[in-house]
Amino acid sequence: MCIEDPFERTPRILLSSDNHQRVSPLRNALLRAGFTVDLASDYRHLELLWHELRHDVVLFEVSHAGSVELATQSAIRIKRQDAKQFVAYLADASLQAVGLIGDAIFSRDAQRLPQALRKVLAEQL
């Protein structure tokens, strides 16, 4: 029986955003850092892809306060189906206290995101 070493492969990330202009630099930074990243066109599409592919990390980029409820509802549906699924958000400090439900909230700083994500994932093991 072969047990997979969690550090042997890079986690697969499923990323979606309410602002398509912001998501490209984030995705590119993660790709450059060696992550595998699939991009969903919106939060609903993210849920559909998650059902099909079951990524290691589900990442919601939330730019607008009006999108918090949609992102949170998607996160809750995912967590209800798989409580162990790692769900995180990318949000400004002003949005971090508005009830986002998940495992982590990261800054949208594209240069720091890969390392911050690796650190949190390593702590989860």
Positions of PLM-derived features:
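A short, hydrophobic beta-strand element within the central beta-sheet of small alpha/beta folds
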Residues: 78-97
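Short hydrophobic/Thr-rich beta-strand motif most characteristic of the beta2 strand and flanking loop
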Residues: 34-42
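Short acidic-hydrophobic, aromatic-tinged amphipathic segments that line or gate anion-handling sites
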Residues: 40, 104-109
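Acidic, metal-coordinating helix/loop segments flanking the phosphotransfer/catalytic sites
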Residues: 41-57
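Conserved beta-strand segments of the P-loop GTPase G domain that flank and frequently precede/overlap
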Residues: 14-16, 58-62, 87-91, 107
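Conserved phosphotransfer microenvironments
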Residues: 59-82
